[in-house]
Regions:
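N-terminal and secondary-structure boundary signal
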Residues: 1-159
C-alpha cells in the first residue's frame, strides 16, 4: 500500500506534473483518485494553491445540476410523482450556499477563504487567486460554457 499523501508530497507531485508559480489552472479532481491524503481535500487545495503561488489562479468547476427541473435529472432519478413537490420547494441558486456535486475537493474549494464563485446556477466555477474576480465576474446564462463565460476567460488566459 502506498504511503498517504501529505502537503509536501503533493507539492512535489504537482511540480512533477508541471504546475508552476503564476499559472492559471482549471482542476477537475477526484479525492479517491488522488489517494488517501492527510488533511483530506483541504490539503489538496493548499497544495494546488501553493504550487501556483500568489500570482497564480486556481479554478474548479462547481456545477449544481440539482438546481433544475427534476424531470431532466438522470442522477439521481426521482419518481415523476415527486416532480411538483420538488419544483415548489427547490431552493434557488445562491453562489454562497448552494453546494456543488463535483466532489469533495471542489466542495471544499467552494468554501475556501478567498474563493469566488460565478453566478451561473447550473455550471458555475470557483476561482481563488490573482485573477479570481476577473474569471468569475460575469457568467452569461445563455451560453453557459462559451462566450461571455469564465470558460472563455480561461481560454483567453491559455489556462
Amino acid at each position: 500500500m502506498p504511503p498517504p499523501n501529505t502537503l509536501s508530497s503533493l507539492h512535489r507531485d504537482l511540480f512533477d506534473l508541471g504546475l508552476r508559480a503564476d499559472m492559471t489552472v482549471m482542476v477537475h479532481s477526484s479525492l479517491g483518485r488522488v489517494g488517501w491524503t492527510v488533511g483530506g481535500p483541504v490539503t489538496v487545495i493548499r497544495a494546488l494553491l501553493g504550487a501556483i503561488g500568489t500570482a497564480g489562479t486556481l479554478v474548479m468547476p462547481t456545477e449544481s445540476p440539482h438546481v433544475s427541473d427534476p424531470s431532466t435529472w438522470n442522477d439521481p432519478r426521482v419518481p415523476p410523482e415527486w416532480y411538483e413537490t420538488i419544483r415548489e420547494n427547490l431552493p434557488v441558486f445562491d453562489p454562497l450556499t448552494t453546494p456543488t456535486t463535483m466532489g469533495a475537493i471542489a466542495e471544499a474549494f467552494r468554501t475556501f477563504p478567498g474563493t469566488r464563485r460565478s453566478n451561473h446556477p447550473l455550471v458555475s466555477v470557483c476561482a481563488n487567486g490573482r485573477r479570481a474576480e476577473e474569471i468569475t465576474k460575469h457568467h452569461a446564462l445563455e451560453f453557459c460554457e462559451g462566450q461571455g463565460t469564465p470558460f472563455e476567460k480561461l481560454y483567453d488566459l491559455d489556462a
